[in-house]
Amino acid sequence: MILEHVLVLSAYLFSIGIYGLITSRNMVRALMCLELILNAVNINFVTFSDFFDSRQLKGDIFSIFVIAIAAAEAAIGLAIVSSIYRNRKSTRINQSNLLNK
């Protein structure tokens, strides 16, 4: 596998995630874009770990750690979104200011 191709793929995923996170008005879509960013970072960890030192598994282990953190973040984020939806009947970011009411 060519290093440049994987890095370009990761950069595309990261850019799509950042663009979606900036322009998203829906909380669920923002969480999905954040997960896309974390997956792009994981691709970089695994790629550099394989390319520079394939005998050690530091990048792979760190990638598994990031996946576990991302799963916990997604679970907590979706719980918060469902709680806000139950109270506000909307998942739009600009309508969920909890300090107003």
UniProtKB/Swiss-Prot annotation:
Family annotation (InterPro entries): NADH_UbQ_OxRdtase_chain4L/K, NUOK/Mnh_C1-like
Spell out the GO cellular component terms annotated for this protein, sorted alphabetically and separated by semicolons. Answer: chloroplast thylakoid membrane; NADH dehydrogenase complex
As its record notes, the protein acts as a catalyst of: a plastoquinone + NADH + (n+1) H(+)(in) = a plastoquinol + NAD(+) + n H(+)(out); a plastoquinone + NADPH + (n+1) H(+)(in) = a plastoquinol + NADP(+) + n H(+)(out)
The EC number(s) attached to this protein equal 7.1.1.-
Q: Which molecular function term from Gene Ontology is one that the record holds?
A: oxidoreductase activity, acting on NAD(P)H, quinone or similar compound as acceptor
The UniProt keyword set, sorted, is: Chloroplast, Membrane, NAD, NADP, Plastid, Plastoquinone, Quinone, Thylakoid, Translocase, Transmembrane, Transmembrane helix, Transport
Note the Pfam families from the entry: Oxidored_q2 (PF00420)
Q: Where in the cell is it found?
A: Plastid, Chloroplast thylakoid membrane
Q: Name one GO biological process term.
A: ATP synthesis coupled electron transport
Source domain of life is Eukaryota
Q: Membrane-spanning residues where?
A: 2-22, 32-52, 61-81
> Does the entry feature the keyword Translocase, yes or no?
yes
Q: Its membrane topology, per UniProt?
A: Multi-pass membrane protein
Name the job this protein performs. Answer: NDH shuttles electrons from NAD(P)H:plastoquinone, via FMN and iron-sulfur (Fe-S) centers, to quinones in the photosynthetic chain and possibly in a chloroplast respiratory chain. The immediate electron acceptor for the enzyme in this species is believed to be plastoquinone. Couples the redox reaction to proton translocation, and thus conserves the redox energy in a proton gradient.
| Assembly, per entry | NDH is composed of at least 16 different subunits, 5 of which are encoded in the nucleus.
Q: Which NCBIfam families match?
A: PRK05715.1-2 (NF004320), PRK05715.1-4 (NF004322), PRK05715.1-5 (NF004323)
Q: What is this protein called?
A: NAD(P)H-quinone oxidoreductase subunit 4L, chloroplastic
Native organism is: Eucalyptus globulus subsp. globulus
